[in-house]
Amino acid sequence: MIYTITTNPAIDYILRFDKFEDGATIRANEDEKYPGGKGIMASKILHNLGEKPVNLGFVGGFIGEYIANSIRDLGLDEKFVRIKENSRINVKLKYDKETEINAKGPKISKEEVEKFFDSLKEIEKGDVIVISGSLPYSLDSDFYKKVIEKTEADFTIDIADKKLLDYLAFKPLLVKPNEEELGKIFQTEINDENLVEYARKLNELGAKNVIVSLGAKGSIFVDENHAYRAKPIEGKLVNSVGAGDSMVGGFVYGMVNKLDKIDAYKLAVACGTATAFSPDIADRDMINQILSKVEVEEIGN
């Protein structure tokens, strides 16, 4: 079983404009609403690949119920803890640029946190937990560490700062920093010459597998024995939201379904790229189209 954790989910409210002018009244050409949050994004791609992940986390108020209902309408399972305060709405403005306005999110009480930890009792050894995203301001900074300690499951972790190092001793199945984040973790500038070296440091510190996304330059995959680079695939960028989460979901799907690591990496690349070329999380047809174009080359060992 695969579980995803979204501690601070949102309605992602997307507004599309031809042109944005600060201080003016503007009518959007289109607007869309999706359940948002990194764990939810990973769940959606896993569902589109044929898995049945369970969404865990916190939702509250009418916004939270909209999120939960939207997830169920997609055919996804959810066991969110209901909290007193409202979940958040994040606004994403899309014109010739992309601007995101993310709300702070609700305060979560100690009693609500304990309910969440109780929900972890059903997770068994051999299950996989996808942990991603920043924590709400009211949760302790070691919240994710407690999740890991309370279960015997494999886990992936995708968080954007140096705190990632604190989780490597628990031997995560996958970590997925981008190039900029990798540099911040080790307080250095990453370039083509040292990219594999610093990705490998994450292996040496405990990560079983590492994917570093490089934007338009593609990505690399590193484990304890090999390093591979996926060439970038040409196409029109439609949506940057959820591409990284789709990569994580694709890799987890591959590992759960006993694919070779390199095939799991190829699927991760296909999922991330397909989502970037789609208005929402990519469907299976789009993933398959992109998968046929994925090329990887070994770049070291």
Question: What do the predicted segments below correspond to?
Answer:
Residues 1-3, 99, 127-128, 209:
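Structural motif
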Residues 46, 178, 244:
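Short, conserved phosphate/pyrophosphate- and ester-handling motifs at nucleotide-, phospho-/glycolipid
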Residues 24, 47-127, 290-301:
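Conserved N-terminal subdomain of the carbohydrate kinase-like
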Residues 193-301:
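Conserved phosphate-binding/catalytic region of the ribokinase-like
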Residues 145-225:
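Conserved phosphate/ATP/ADP-binding segment of small-molecule kinases
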Residues 100-102, 126-133, 176-181:
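Short beta-strands and strand-loop turn motifs
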Residues 1-56, 64-66, 301:
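Glycine-rich phosphate/adenosyl-contacting loop at the front of the ribokinase-like
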Residues 54, 79, 130, 156-158, ...:
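Structural detector of well-ordered beta-strand residues that form the stable sheet scaffold
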